[in-house]
Every structure is written in structure tokens, then in C-alpha cells.
From Swiss-Prot:
One of its GO terms (molecular function) is DNA binding. Keywords: DNA-binding. This is Chromosomal protein MC1. One of its GO terms (biological process) is DNA protection. It comes from Methanosarcina barkeri.
Amino acid sequence: SNTRNFVLRDEEGNEHGVFTGKQPRQAALKAANRGDGTKSNPDVIRLRERGTKKVHVFKAWKEMVEAPKNRPDWMPEKISKPFVKKEKIEKIE
């Protein structure tokens, strides 16, 4: 399996939380679902790929959307859907 680990960093470079995904975007979506960003005021998510000096920077937010018609019983009618938009890649020295 080629799952990659992405570590969530804050502005100070402290790292908390690992999100997995085959692509940085996948990990960013998982992180976005935990944040409080909105479309007008998105969170900034910085994910460093484990074992590299690359930090993927995303803008992230959630929107309430209608759940799919064939949703399981436990799923509410409205669900929050994460969105991410890649901003840039930073290199750590």
C-alpha cells in the first residue's frame, strides 16, 4: 500500500496529528473536516509529508450539504462536506 503520512503543522512549526492519505489532498480533506473554516474565512492547513521537507499548504473549509439520497439511517439529512484548495508547497530548511 502506498499510504502516505502527513503531519499537521501550525504557524510556529509545532506538529500535531497525523493524517493519512494516498494524496496530500486526501489528508487535507480529513484535516478540513476537523476544522472550523468557512468559505469566506477558510482555515489554513499545513501538512508536512513524513520523511520529506515539503509542506503542502491548503485553504480549507466545510459546507453543509444535503446528504445523498441513499444515505444510511444513522446519517443526518445535512452533512458537512470538506473542501480544500491547494495554495502552495513550502520547503523546510
